[in-house]
Regions:
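Long, charge-patterned amphipathic interaction tracts in eukaryotic proteins
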Residues: 1-11, 40-139
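A long, low-hydrophobicity, low-complexity, charged/polar interaction segment common
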Residues: 85-210
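Core catalytic machinery and nucleic-acid-binding channels of phosphodiester-processing enzymes
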Residues: 1-22, 30, 182
Length: 210
């Protein structure tokens, strides 16, 4: 769902590496062929081309990442906007009359409404089931990714571990599982994916600090 972000990061990485190599080669040739004011002018021109190439790739790929995340936010919003089934309220009222619903009864009710956001949330709250992933959690996750991407494009060196980890590590894949499950109405899976994502990110932090 957000695999395009990894592609955009890789594109920016490759452009930056290539532009750096071209700049270093150009500077070497300039140093070998020019002196004085001409040396300074040619060096300035080479660096301007390098910076322009980097800026163009940065803007293009960063904007592509933001567009992908905006699409996720839009899909999540549509999921939340889905109305509850017409029979849900009566079902919930009937459930409230039971002092001790059986495991099978609980599974039946959950199974009937597990793909509707508000119905599933209400059932989980009433039956004290594991707290579902809310749309606010999804929006917070999106904000976290945006923060990390800004650092990748505007702070981190593309050869640094923190940048490469966004491409080579499991960060994006972990978020992708959460977003995909939520936007497909698989709210039970979203809970597991969110926990797995949090555990994975915490492990990445420990490895980085170690």
């Amino acid at each position: 769902m957000i695999e395009g972000i990894g592609i955009a990061l890789q594109s920016y990485h490759d452009t930056a590496i290539s532009a750096k190599a071209i700049l270093e080669s150009a500077i070497a040739q300039i140093n070998a062929n020019y002196i004085g004011a001409m040396l300074a002018e040619k060096t300035k021109e080479a660096k301007e081309i390098y910076n322009s190439t980097l800026a163009e790739s940065r803007t293009e790929n960063y904007d592509a990442c933001l567009a992908i995340l905006d699409e996720v936010a839009g899909q999540a919003k549509k999921i939340v906007e889905q109305p509850v089934p017409s029979d849900f309220i009566s079902t919930l009222e009937a459930l409230k009359q039971m002092k001790e619903p059986t495991k099978t009864e609980i599974e039946t009710v959950v199974g009937a409404y597990k793909n509707n956001y508000f119905a599933y949330r209400a059932i989980c709250d009433f039956l004290k089931l594991p707290k579902p992933v809310t749309v606010d959690v999804i929006n917070d996750d999106i904000a976290d990714i945006k923060s990390g991407l800004y650092k990748c494009f505007y702070s981190y060196n593309v050869e640094a571990y923190r940048f490469r980890n966004w491409i080579e590590g499991n960060i994006l894949a972990s978020y992708d599982e959460v977003f995909r499950a939520f936007c497909e109405g698989r709210f039970e899976d979203a809970v597991q994916s969110e926990q797995g994502k949090d555990d994975g990110i915490e492990a990445e932090k420990l490895n980085n600090n170690g």
